[in-house]
């Protein structure tokens, strides 16, 4: 979502599961605008965003738009894959550019590492001198990874620890709030709430604060607003001469920050 001259713009995925049987793509990108965030007006821009030749028409989704100040244009990225077997590792992020948010030009691949079967929920933001590109990789690992670059043209560098959280912290995106970059995604639930069962399509919302380390890589931590949401409850004290105590918040056992090991 973007606000330009008091008008809000939202770009989203339009989906029709019956279209493939009619020879049409099941997914297209859509554009709507609003002056009050209540009443929205769809545009007819979907035709501009149809899957391009050579790309899978049924895996073309999750647009993300930023303002590219250096080139005086808007940049839209989305998740895609090449046409072919779904098991092939042809996932990529593709890009469009525009001067007015209405007329878009397809610019090809933005990041195409051929490491994953699909890129989902791509994100792009800048902290200091570094650009960061986040995707949720659709594979057996199903986790969020990121790359970093000092230019939107790349090269995109893979840090040693390139993931946020673990397996099945999924489909996250970020926003900036009061100078903080918050990453919000969901953690999948196991069938019948049994750890030995498969993941199911549902889960628990989880927010991380993303912060930049001195070397430019990213880390995550619990947002202060979450820490401050409730008072800790004493669970028990460890009977040793260091006097450590364990507290519980939201049914999770936490060690107070002043006792935590620092990286």
Regions found by a protein language model. Give the residues of each.
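Secretory/extracellular carbohydrate-interaction modules
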Residues: 236-263
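Beta-rich carbohydrate-recognition and catalytic domains
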Residues: 1, 5-62, 66-121, 126-165, ...
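Active-site/pore-lining binding-face segments in mid-to-C-terminal subdomains
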Residues: 166, 171
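Short, well-structured beta-strand segments enriched in hydrophobic/aromatic residues
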Residues: 181-183
């Amino acid at each position: 979502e973007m606000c330009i001259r008091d008008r809000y713009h939202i770009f989203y995925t339009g989906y029709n599961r019956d279209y493939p049987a009619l020879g049409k793509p099941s997914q297209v990108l859509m554009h709507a605008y609003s002056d009050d965030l209540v009443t929205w007006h769809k545009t007819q821009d979907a035709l501009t965003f149809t899957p391009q030749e050579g790309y899978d028409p049924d895996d073309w989704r999750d647009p993300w738009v930023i303002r590219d100040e250096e080139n005086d244009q808007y940049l839209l990225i989305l998740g895609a894959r090449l046409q072919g077997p779904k098991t092939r590792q042809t996932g990529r992020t593709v890009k469009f550019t525009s001067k007015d948010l209405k007329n878009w030009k397809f610019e090809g691949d933005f990041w195409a590492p051929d490491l994953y079967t699909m890129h989902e929920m791509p994100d792009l933001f800048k902290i200091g001198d570094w650009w960061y590109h986040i995707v949720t990789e659709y594979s057996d690992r199903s986790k969020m990874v990121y790359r970093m670059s000092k230019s939107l043209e790349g090269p995109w560098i893979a840090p040693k620890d390139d993931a946020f959280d673990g397996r099945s912290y999924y489909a996250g995106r970020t926003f900036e709030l009061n100078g903080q970059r918050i990453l919000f995604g969901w953690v999948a639930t196991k069938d019948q709430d049994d750890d030995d069962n498969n993941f199911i399509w549902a889960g628990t919302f989880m927010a991380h604060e993303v912060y930049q380390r001195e070397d430019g890589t990213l880390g995550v931590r619990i947002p202060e607003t979450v820490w401050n949401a409730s008072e800790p409850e004493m669970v028990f004290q460890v009977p040793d001469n260091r006097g450590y105590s364990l507290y519980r918040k939201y049914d999770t056992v936490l060690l107070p920050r002043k006792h935590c090991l620092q990286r």
